């Protein structure tokens, strides 16, 4: 049994700190706290009305994916990871992550509610897991890992991929919009959320490094490649980034770069199959 998964009554108290690196990352997460009220959307609507039909389509579908994905991450945290892990330092992080994912979900829902005036279209976006095949495909992959009977090590790799790969291309696309000087509320919230998700992905890698018996490099690489292929399809075929003037080929390369970095963090070599 992995030490961090070994049941102990010490999980009910925080001190004395045993895993100082995990505790440090928890405190880093707390220091990054923010709320949706800090994001000013008042100037976004003027920019929204200036966007092309394709640009609006792209942003709406990206927001629809994000609005549903944070709830999936939270379900995994509440049902699996918080139950799996027995050290109080990690439970503190997971508990705070749940709170932050709720704020992310609220932010994305508020963005959709602000930009989309038609109520029928709005509900279509809020129910993207059911109404959009491209969003459903990503959601199904993540939910498959929530219900999986695989060991914690494999599941933590999968959710590192969700937060490190499934989100990365969409974050980059919104940063592209920022470079054009548009949508200050959207782009500021993107900065805050991408910072949080980067920390969540780093924490998954940290938890992985605490495993004495991690999954094989072959298993890790297979999980990452699977996520990369789904993300490439999402941003180059289903909702292609060329709708907002980005290069699909370069986006694919960026996703590969992110995946290679994640593989390195997980102790693997860069994959030639990505």
Swiss-Prot record:
Fe cation 1 binds at residues 70, 101, 104. Its EC number is 1.17.4.1. Keywords: Deoxyribonucleotide synthesis, Iron, Metal-binding, Oxidoreductase. PROSITE patterns: RIBORED_SMALL. The keyword Oxidoreductase applies. The keyword Acyltransferase does not apply. Binds 2 iron ions per subunit. The active site is at 108. InterPro entries: Ferritin-like_SF (IPR009078), RNR-like (IPR012348), RNR_small (IPR033909), RNR_small_AS (IPR030475), RNR_small_fam (IPR000358). Fe cation 2 binds at residues 101, 163, 197, 200. Its cofactor is Fe cation. GO terms for molecular function: metal ion binding; ribonucleoside-diphosphate reductase activity, thioredoxin disulfide as acceptor. Coiled coil: none annotated. It is an enzyme of class 1 (oxidoreductase). Belongs to the ribonucleoside diphosphate reductase small chain family. Ribonucleoside-diphosphate reductase holoenzyme provides the precursors necessary for viral DNA synthesis. Allows virus growth in non-dividing cells. Catalyzes the biosynthesis of deoxyribonucleotides from the corresponding ribonucleotides. This is Ribonucleoside-diphosphate reductase small chain.
């Amino acid at each position: 049994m992995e030490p961090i998964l070994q049941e102990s009554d010490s999980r009910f108290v925080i001190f004395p700190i045993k895993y100082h690196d995990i505790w440090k990352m928890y405190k880093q997460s707390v220091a990054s706290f923010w709320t949706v009220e800090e994001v000013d959307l008042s100037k976004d609507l003027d920019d929204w009305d200036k966007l092309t039909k394709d640009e609006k389509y792209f942003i709406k579908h990206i927001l629809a994916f994000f609005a549903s994905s944070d709830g999936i991450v939270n379900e995994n945290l509440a049902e699996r990871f918080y139950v799996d892990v027995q050290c109080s330092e990690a439970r503190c992080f997971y508990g705070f992550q749940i709170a932050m994912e709720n704020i992310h979900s609220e932010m994305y829902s508020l963005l959709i509610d602000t930009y989309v005036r038609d109520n029928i279209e709005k509900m279509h976006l809020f129910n993207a897991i059911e109404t959009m095949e491209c969003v459903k495909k990503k959601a199904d992959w993540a939910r498959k890992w929530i219900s999986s009977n695989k060991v914690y090590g494999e599941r933590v790799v999968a959710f590192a991929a969700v937060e490190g790969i499934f989100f990365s291309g969409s974050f980059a696309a919104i940063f592209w919009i920022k470079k054009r000087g548009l949508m200050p509320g959207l782009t500021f919230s993107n900065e805050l959320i991408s910072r949080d998700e980067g920390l969540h992905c780093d924490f998954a890698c940290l938890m992985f490094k605490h495993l004495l018996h991690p999954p094989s490099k072959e298993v890790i690489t297979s999980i990452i490649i699977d996520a990369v292929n789904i993300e490439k399809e999402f941003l180059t075929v289903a909702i292609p980034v060329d709708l907002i003037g980005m290069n699909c080929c370069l986006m694919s390369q960026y996703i590969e770069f992110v995946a290679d970095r994640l593989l390195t963090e997980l102790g693997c070599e860069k994959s030639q199959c990505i």
